[in-house]
Amino acid sequence: MRGRLSIFENKINKFLRQKQDIMKNESFNLLIYNNMRNKQFIPLFLFFLFAASAVYGQFPGGRATFNFLSSPSSARLTGLGGTQISVSDSDINLVGSNPAVLNQNMTGKLGLNHFFLPGNIQSGNAAYAFTIADNKTWLHLGLHFIQYGEMPRTDEYFQTNGTFKANENRMSVGVAHSIDDRLQIGSTLSFAQSSLGEFVSSALVLDAGLFYTDSSKLTTIGIVYRNAGLQLNPYFSGNSKEPLPNDIQIAISKKLRYLPFRFTLLYNHLNRWNVRYYNPDNESARLIIGEELAEPAQIAIFVDNLFRHIILNGELIVGANENFKLRMAYNHRSRMEFGTVGVGGLNGFSFGFGLKIKRFSFDFGRSIYHLGGGLTHIGITTQLKKNIF
């Protein structure tokens, strides 16, 4: 039966599944907030993160199922390198990366986004938020879908036997609470389902995050543990359950005092150090050149691996009401994994813009993955005149 899905697996692995290597746990330092009213929360959150890191480290190779959970949920996030966990404004779509950034300015907002993927694969997101208690606790609802379309059904001998359809969906409900004017916490609980023809799998997913703002309101810090949870049932009866694509991220954003610009430094995959992988293209280069290529120095390997954890992005903000935004980001891991040996290009870079007209916001994002092209994301967000709930 596995052979029936061979074409589908080749298709989605190329675009939605990043190659991963053996993992190592890494300790890390989190922010310390001395003036926090609830001082018991930080130790509990630290314990939660480290415990999750230890559990995830048990899965050899770091391979996971439900990798669509890691895809960017909005055009703005695509333009900022795929994620943004340390910014909180009026954009409801930001809760897709960190549920703790939900705030009063997002209530009553409805966000709709569509992602154009290769092979006519279509993906979309919807998000909505509202207040539930004293303007300090907010709830958000979300829906994420991917339609892979109709594909040939083949057996292990690559003989075509009809067609099948495949899709993946995620339904979410999340909550955020403001402890005081500088610290917020939040979490999102999701039910995810994946259907590959007659083979169906489901999962329960949890995101948990922190968001901190300094006294100047110019520096913000975000910490999030994404895609914790478990696979409820595997695709094939009797098979062992697979891990989800867990990712612990920390980021700091700085808005310049005298210039309308904000930059962000994000470090992802805190729960494993080695994110490099064996690249067979290097072997092809050896064959073409006809001689052995020198192995990279250990310091070069260390630096390359370090920068694969990092995403850099910037956002130029124009207008007193932030009516226009230009965005650009660089993801070194994407550049190295999707690049062609000996050939340059813009893979790893992404860009986009946002335009606000009255109560409507329009966003465009494009991420360059390969010389052959990139992925385009568009979105619209509006303030509803009357709350749904």
Label each residue range with its predicted role.
Residues 1-61, 314, 374:
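Bacterial Sec-dependent N-terminal signal peptides
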Residues 58-389:
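Subset of outer-membrane beta-barrel
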